[in-house]
Amino acid sequence: MTKEEALKAFAYMGAVWFGNSKQHFAFSAYDRLNGWNKLADKWKAEAEEEWDEAEEVLNRLVELGCKPADLQEAMKTIEFPFYDDPKQQIESDYQPTAVEEMSKLAQAFADDYPTQKLILKWIDGEKEHMEWEAQYLKLIDRLGYDNFLMAMM
């Protein structure tokens, strides 16, 4: 991956996080309205974390010398679908390949320690994110869907 390709991929990551953040805020609001407050709290925390990560991408791009016109890719928002079904919310967000993709991006920034360090931090967060989603999907299978929803109240 060339340096230019790596920067574009890095900027795209910011756009994805802005979009995911909006999606997760929507999931949180909908789940809270339905009384699934534990799940709503989880989505809200994820939304806030992803918003912060998107801001970190923007800040790092500016530190790397990107001008406002160059930040267009990172500033756009990738749109994600909205699901009113909590199981679909979790399944749609569960992306086991994300850690591998982020690891490749971290390798592309081997000569840029500050950027690589940020990406490695985000990989740890993504692993935690995948763990709770996998855990919740297992709970749905083990408890049954209705019992899972009751547990989320």
Which residues does each predicted region cover?
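Iron-associated oxidoreductase/ferritin-like identity signal
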Residues: 1-153
